[in-house]
């Protein structure tokens, strides 16, 4: 009896050892499952492939091009920029307007653009770079200038003819005035001005002669006044003064004080005519 009991104890010990080995075998499969989960987590971390390459240039280049070409003093609005880009770039996404708004905000935050009210401008530092683009067009303009130079060479041929006309017209005094309107040489202007002055004085002297014939008493005072301007005039006016002085000696018999007094007397009768008319009526009534 005693010999059977130890055998039972050994069997129980073996049975207890068996589950431990089973537990140890169950742990390794759990590790392999974790390894699978780790590999699955790495797949989303891989970079995503873009569905298609964009057919339009970067947003900043499109916005910059729109602002430079529009050339608005206070900046270009979002609506104007979108309209310009839509006209120029035809292959744009459907949500282009929303993307453009986010890009504008992004560029303002990064100080690539300056926002003034509801308009967007380029900062002052980027304007010289933008001005370099139109600078390429200047050589084309320089090429067109040589073509315009032959026209300028043709014009000098017409100028000598224009100068010859005023030279021909400067001889008669009457034709000198239209020549002055056509912008002649500076020498023709003083000559045109001097001739009418010389002719105006003989007319004044000629006008003085009939008055002297009608009123011999008033002639001495007028001849003296005519002598003073003749000193400044040319020799032609001096001759007229000499002829006037020769006529005066024969008429010196007239009283000297009367010529100065008779001129105001002629003006006075016009005023005195009214006063005797009023006084004449009572005298006739008394008679």
UniProtKB/Swiss-Prot annotation:
One of its GO terms (biological process) is chromosome condensation. Coiled coil: none annotated. PANTHER family: HISTONE H1. It comes from Solanum lycopersicum (Tomato). Histones H1 are necessary for the condensation of nucleosome chains into higher-order structures. One of its GO terms (cellular component) is nucleus. Residues 1-58, 120-287 are annotated as: Disordered. Residues 1-11, 203-248 have a biased composition (Low complexity). CDD domains: H15. PROSITE patterns: H15. Residues 33-51, 135-202, 276-287 have a biased composition (Basic residues). It is found in: Nucleus; Chromosome. Keywords: Chromosome, DNA-binding, Nucleus. Belongs to the histone H1/H5 family. One of its GO terms (molecular function) is structural constituent of chromatin. Residues 55-124 form the H15 domain. This is Histone H1. It comes from the Eukaryota. Its main location: nucleus.
